[in-house]
Curated annotation (Swiss-Prot):
Organism encoding this protein: Hordeum vulgare (Barley)
EC nos: 1.13.11.27
Gene Ontology MF annotations: 4-hydroxyphenylpyruvate dioxygenase activity; metal ion binding
GO cellular component, one term: cytoplasm
Coiled coil: none
Domain named VOC: residues: 41-192, 208-368
Reported cofactor(s): Fe cation
Family statement drawn from the similarity comment of this UniProt entry: Belongs to the 4HPPD family.
Residues reported to bind Fe cation: H211, H293, E379
Protein name: 4-hydroxyphenylpyruvate dioxygenase
BP term (GO), one: L-phenylalanine catabolic process
Cofactor binding summary note: Binds 1 Fe cation per subunit.
Amino acid sequence: MPPTPTTPAATGAAAAVTPEHARPHRMVRFNPRSDRFHTLSFHHVEFWCADAASAAGRFAFALGAPLAARSDLSTGNSAHASQLLRSGSLAFLFTAPYANGCDAATASLPSFSADAARRFSADHGIAVRSVALRVADAAEAFRASRRRGARPAFAPVDLGRGFAFAEVELYGDVVLRFVSHPDGTDVPFLPGFEGVTNPDAVDYGLTRFDHVVGNVPELAPAAAYIAGFTGFHEFAEFTAEDVGTTESGLNSVVLANNSEGVLLPLNEPVHGTKRRSQIQTFLEHHGGPGVQHIAVASSDVLRTLRKMRARSAMGGFDFLPPPLPKYYEGVRRLAGDVLSEAQIKECQELGVLVDRDDQGVLLQIFTKPVGDRPTLFLEMIQRIGCMEKDERGEEYQKGGCGGFGKGNFSELFKSIEDYEKSLEAKQSAAVQGS
């Protein structure tokens, strides 16, 4: 793992940087600690899909995240099949409905609706249904959210074993789920799930969710709604001028909880550009607002990428094309005091992007869409630096260390634009040939 940076971004070797990296980040350093309820961390992200075993199997293979728990016919659940993948504190849940007429009372997820799940899959393909937060008290989080204008999705329920569960609407058909449970519980996930042991499981080094990004038609009302009922504060903002290309752009804001360990960025499309915004493309193919991408943190993203790329051609995930070699000359000037020459060369070989703010360094890479539609994708990420100590003297990393890749947005946008252009060219050729 690369060492922690010892010099600020604006001094030393990092002072001479490429123009893209030279532009200042609009990072909001003031933390008002304004949460409406005590939010501890991400708990899980749930996908609704047509077949849980198939979807979970592909993600497990691609990410090196083994099956950790299940709830299905084998556990007495005839309403839905759910499979949980886990790596570190990272938890991906995949849920699919069984046939019509099954006993809804056997569901381990109390808010599950087979009819709604079928509509969801038909409307969105494989997509995120629930962004779940671990909170101190799910019932209180629900009540506090409702008092501040949150639209209810599922009222609080006691699951037993000290677990509580509730949901409010987030954006589109996505819900924000509240889960509370005692520390040190021996329940493998939620009551009703059975643990799965796999002594031969692989480990690619994935540790946790870093952030979960939503695409919406209009940023201001969506951000005001979510910030209003959660109390989450603005952590960063970007505009089309900051992060677009000459052909398209977006506006974005990042919301964060008190600890800044839960980060919820939101994007909106910019209209009137040469090309249709990539955010608008998402909204059209997804069928409305939804989760655009999930950033997954790694303790060593270069190792993680070597493992993942080895499986790309065998059913794993594909990655966006790497930037041109000249990009990495800028990386040497930007982060050569933190990354060794061997590490920079490996970043170039693997297509990893590098950025830096005044507190830390960011390594990131993006997959191509993981389903049939050009919508949901993943980001693999490593943050370097920003280490602090809590009141117990234990070291931890500040949330959002190294920023959100503002210096790489133009590179990312160009890569996605090229990918979309290739799809459009093939569609045009197919139409002309018909």
